[in-house]
């Protein structure tokens, strides 16, 4: 049974860019990995309770911590050039963190996709073949439940992105759940060719949640139109919640 009470960690607020005039748009685009402010709303809609009740415990074995990808005015993170340590300059943002969510019915099951943005990620490039990483990374997980209810839905399974493929667990094993949250781990393969998610017994942290529909029009447009695959990674980097990708991901990661 999936059941939880919404707490302040999952409050979602729209940050108004004009409240911080010293950060102009150019600066935000250039150094947003250290300047992007998360979305937080003190009055989340009813659906927020369902998304929060299945929000995921996020542990990091390897690589960057998740960051906000976009601000309310549409300014997008410029990411980090791949260099140095896997988590170099990306161990967490003082301006908050973020997990993005979008949900839909699929094959008579209710799918909730959660997506995390990272300023850089592991994985080969087509052009610089000796590089073991690239600018920008998106990882996602799909939680499958029987109905969109915070108090009366049953957890059926989880799918997790992993390079060009995915991991799955259906049903989810008890050791991979804490409270009503599935425990996930962000990691990469030994040679760094793939980065993705897996279930774990380790407890991680949670990020402030924002629904795709709650983003400003400018933020949604920027996430849709921005080319996050500027380094031409062998596994293309794309925002999984946007319209032309979301349904394809549900289809390709269906675990039943």
UniProtKB/Swiss-Prot annotation:
<dbReference type="Pfam" id="PF05630">
    <property type="entry name" value="NPP1"/>
</dbReference>
<dbReference type="GO" id="GO:0005576">
    <property type="term" value="C:extracellular region"/>
</dbReference>
<comment type="similarity">
    <text>Belongs to the Necrosis inducing protein (NPP1) family.</text>
</comment>
<protein>
    <recommendedName>
        <fullName>Necrosis-inducing protein NPP1</fullName>
    </recommendedName>
</protein>
<comment type="function">
    <text>Secreted effector that acts as a pathogen-associated molecular pattern (PAMP) recognized by the plant immune system.</text>
</comment>
<keyword id="KW-0843">Virulence</keyword>
<dbReference type="InterPro" id="IPR008701">
    <property type="entry name" value="NPP1"/>
</dbReference>
<feature type="short sequence motif" description="Conserved undecapeptide motif">
    <location>
        <begin position="111"/>
        <end position="121"/>
    </location>
</feature>
<keyword id="KW-0964">Secreted</keyword>
<feature type="short sequence motif" description="Conserved heptapeptide motif">
    <location>
        <begin position="133"/>
        <end position="139"/>
    </location>
</feature>
């Amino acid at each position: 049974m999936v059941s939880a009470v919404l707490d302040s960690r999952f409050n979602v607020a729209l940050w108004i860019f004009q409240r911080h005039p010293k950060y102009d748009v150019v600066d935000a685009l250039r150094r947003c990995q250290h300047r992007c402010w998360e979305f937080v709303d003190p009055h989340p809609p009813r659906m927020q309770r369902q998304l929060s009740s299945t929000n995921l415990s996020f542990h990091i074995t390897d690589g960057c911590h998740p960051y906000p990808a976009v601000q309310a005015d549409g300014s997008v993170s410029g990411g980090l050039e791949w260099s140095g340590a896997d988590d170099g300059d990306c161990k967490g943002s003082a301006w908050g963190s973020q997990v993005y969510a979008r949900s839909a019915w699929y094959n008579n099951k209710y799918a909730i996709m959660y997506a995390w943005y990272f300023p850089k990620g592991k994985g080969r490039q087509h052009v610089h073949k000796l590089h073991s990483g690239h600018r920008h990374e998106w990882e996602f997980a799909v939680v499958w439940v029987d109905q969109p209810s915070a108090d009366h839905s049953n957890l059926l399974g989880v799918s997790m992105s992993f390079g060009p493929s995915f991991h799955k667990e259906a049903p989810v094993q008890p050791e991979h759940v804490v409270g009503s949250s599935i425990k996930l781990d962000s990691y990469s393969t030994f040679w760094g060719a793939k980065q993705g998610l897996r279930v774990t017994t380790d407890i991680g942290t949670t990020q402030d949640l924002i629904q795709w529909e709650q983003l400003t029009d400018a933020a949604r447009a920027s996430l849709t139109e921005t080319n996050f695959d500027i380094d031409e990674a062998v596994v293309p980097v794309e925002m999984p919640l946007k319209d032309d990708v979301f349904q394809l991901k549900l289809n390709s990661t269906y675990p039943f």
